[in-house]
Amino acid sequence: MPPPQQGPCGHHLLLLLALLLPSLPLTRAPVPPGPAAALLQALGLRDEPQGAPRLRPVPPVMWRLFRRRDPQETRSGSRRTSPGVTLQPCHVEELGVAGNIVRHIPDRGAPTRASEPASAAGHCPEWTVVFDLSAVEPAERPSRARLELRFAAAAAAAPEGGWELSVAQAGQGAGADPGPVLLRQLVPALGPPVRAELLGAAWARNASWPRSLRLALALRPRAPAACARLAEASLLLVTLDPRLCHPLARPRRDAEPVLGGGPGGACRARRLYVSFREVGWHRWVIAPRGFLANYCQGQCALPVALSGSGGPPALNHAVLRALMHAAAPGAADLPCCVPARLSPISVLFFDNSDNVVLRQYEDMVVDECGCR
């Protein structure tokens, strides 16, 4: 069902989003004031990204992670979890680690690599790959760093014993020798992507983030054979930002909340659809196209405050205030209609470094309202 037409202008939607999203202290230079800047700050962005980079498709792993978390995808029939099973907040089930930010970071090294010469004694060239980590905030804690390599084999058949992959810290200057080897692993075949876990090898779990990660790679056949060519390198980085992770956060419900219509009536959630196209962010927000933010509106007078109006029961304090207001209107104000149940959303977008980022934001959707 297409989203309903909205009356508020884009500026009002930006202001609403800026109020909904958490305000995070950044260590970088302050951004200009205003609703748009406040929302960009909450998204962890210094400036508004320019849009999707040319010839930069969204990696399939990022689509899979997003679709598993998006409630619209699960309701449309592409459910990746069993009915009744809820996703643990601030946890990436597919990778088995804690986290609420997933980045797919491409290699910023040489854009093209020439074919490698044949090797008669296992001596093959090395490659240097560079990953830009400048967008990672100091408060983020790494939980997984997976190097993924795709090779174009010069020979159809794998050498006897396969290949050996070695990863070392690359030297900083031109012609500088690489540092000590961080890891070695056997690669039996080059058809599927070659993956190597770097966390604990490239840097310690509690170490400060480098601005970039430079690695020297070598793939040597264990028997005389032609060398392979490195076609693509990327880093899948999962981090946990505790500022965006609520210990008591509730998972998103599968069913849509019961929403009210007009402004009158009892306290309940009212429908509000926020479109990223309306605010001009569709060029760099990959998915979703928008989301139901909703808002609370309605009366909390008796008997609504006693019944809970179909939502959660009102607090005893709210009932007491409603009783006092009914007996003596000047003695106490009516309770307020406020969110009683909130749920998160996941946003897939390009950041300022053209990385594909999947980020979860808590308390973005009003599911239920109550008198407080």
UniProtKB/Swiss-Prot annotation:
InterPro entries: Cystine-knot_cytokine, TGF-b_C, TGF-beta-rel, TGFb_CS. Residues 30-253 form a propeptide. One of its GO terms (molecular function) is cytokine activity. Residues 1-29 form the signal peptide. GO terms for cellular component: extracellular space. Glycans are attached at N206. Expressed in the brain. Disulfide bonds join C267-C337, C296-C369, C300-C371. SMART domains: TGFB. Keywords: Cleavage on pair of basic residues, Cytokine, Disease variant, Disulfide bond, Glycoprotein, Growth factor, Secreted, Signal. Residues 67-86 are annotated as: Disordered. It is found in: Secreted. GO terms for biological process: endoderm development; in utero embryonic development; mesoderm development. This protein is produced by a bicistronic gene which also produces the CERS1 protein from a non-overlapping reading frame. It is linked to Conotruncal heart malformations: A group of congenital heart defects involving the outflow tracts. Examples include truncus arteriosus communis, double-outlet right ventricle and transposition of great arteries. Truncus arteriosus communis is characterized by a single outflow tract instead of a separate aorta and pulmonary artery. In transposition of the great arteries, the aorta arises from the right ventricle and the pulmonary artery from the left ventricle. In double outlet of the right ventricle, both the pulmonary artery and aorta arise from the right ventricle. May mediate cell differentiation events during embryonic development. Belongs to the TGF-beta family. Homodimer; disulfide-linked. This is Embryonic growth/differentiation factor 1. It comes from Homo sapiens (Human).
